[in-house]
């Protein structure tokens, strides 16, 4: 498990990513001009899917707020995020 508190990033390709079975818990996060602030996915078949839980965040000027594969979970401010229409295309960006 990884816990992140009081993090910020400006002008970045990606923000916080959970992959291959990692569990990431973040709070008090600010991103500006981060293309993909949040992501969760399974890259290697021998590992599990990612879990990313973020509370109290602000993201501005992003391409897409999050990407995830079908089985990974992204929870932003207590709301479980569903796959968005650009997921498959955008996942290749963070691989």
Segment roles from a protein language model:
Residues 1-95:
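Extracellular beta-rich repeat passengers
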């Amino acid at each position: 498990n990884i816990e992140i508190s009081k993090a910020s990033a400006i002008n970045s390709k990606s923000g916080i990513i959970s992959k291959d079975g990692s569990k990431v818990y973040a709070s008090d996060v600010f991103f500006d001009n981060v293309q993909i602030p949040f992501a969760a996915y399974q890259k290697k078949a021998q590992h599990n899917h990612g879990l990313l839980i973020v509370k109290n965040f602000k993201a501005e000027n992003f391409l897409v707020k999050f990407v995830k594969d079908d089985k990974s979970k992204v929870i932003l401010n207590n709301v479980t995020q569903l796959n968005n229409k650009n997921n498959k295309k955008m996942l290749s960006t963070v691989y």
